[in-house]
């Protein structure tokens, strides 16, 4: 029986290779052509380039827009700016390195840069993830009024922005200190938490379960509960005003928005959660590394589609962006449903 060569400390390839020196396949030293043809790497490079350009542009524009237009700086818009900062974090620290590495077909920047890139991209991704949960919670708090006549003020908005960063640091720091680690993932051209190696030295299984519970199940449960309560509240309001066409239209549009928001979250994080759980439950089995690249790509792509869902579908933000970029002043309907859904401060104005 052929002896299986020992894996290198800084990377892991879950497929059999007819070679005793796995260091010769190091993703920090040589192109990873044994994992796929050059066309796949070039396609991924182009994809990451567009994600970088699109993600950086739309999120910088959101931040600049908020700075320029005072009416966008409401307390309940703080978290949307926080989401844009998190997306910008991923777009700047994750996508460019991946783009250049895919172009060279290996992680050309070395093991130390891999740890840094993995940490920063994970940090930004987790901040964005928790920001989506906070968006849902704040809307539930203001629209459903579970605390009665509650006024959402600056301290609440600031706390809502700080919480995602604390939660993200709690999730992204452990691999730097021995609980799991950051290594090349998928086609070995980008880095992230180690969720598929068989090395028990890093306790990867427990870290994966921690991420699944704390960074997927809890935020997703929060989003489903809060938006579910919001829909129930609006349905009751629509039932009470059955003769109002605008109320009925509002309920339909809110329902569509909620579905889009929940699907956006699932597209971003469900592949990571499901694939990592499959790896943990099928420890040591071979799998296609090209499939392992998909979750990373979808999470990085969220830097583009999350702003579209949460910012560009907001009439106030969209109008201000058009005015800033094109000089056009689009007339807003302040009573519109889109404003009620994405600019929730209009539902419960401050006293």
Swiss-Prot record:
A Pfam family assignment: 7tm_1
Transmembrane residues, as ranges? Answer: 41-65, 78-103, 118-137, 157-180, 207-234, 257-280, 289-313
Cystine bridges: which residues?
Answer: 114-191
Xref: PROSITE patterns: G_PROTEIN_RECEP_F1_1 (PS00237), G_PROTEIN_RECEP_F1_2 (PS50262), OPSIN (PS00238)
Give the UniProt tissue specificity note.
The color pigments are found in the cone photoreceptor cells.
State the compartments where it is located.
Answer: Membrane
All ranges on the Cytoplasmic side of the membrane: 66-77, 138-156, 235-256, 314-351
* InterPro entries hit by this protein: GPCR_opsins (IPR050125), GPCR_Rhodpsn (IPR000276), GPCR_Rhodpsn_7TM (IPR017452), Opsin (IPR001760), Opsin_blue (IPR001521), Retinal_BS (IPR027430)
> Where do glycans attach?
21
Q: How is it placed in the membrane, per its record?
A: Multi-pass membrane protein
Reading the lineage from the top rank, the first entry is Eukaryota
Q: Which residues carry this modification: N6-(retinylidene)lysine?
A: 300
Name the family the entry cites: Belongs to the G-protein coupled receptor 1 family. Opsin subfamily.
Its biological purpose = Visual pigments are the light-absorbing molecules that mediate vision. They consist of an apoprotein, opsin, covalently linked to cis-retinal.
Protein name per the record: Blue-sensitive opsin
Please report the organism this UniProt entry assigns to the protein. Carassius auratus
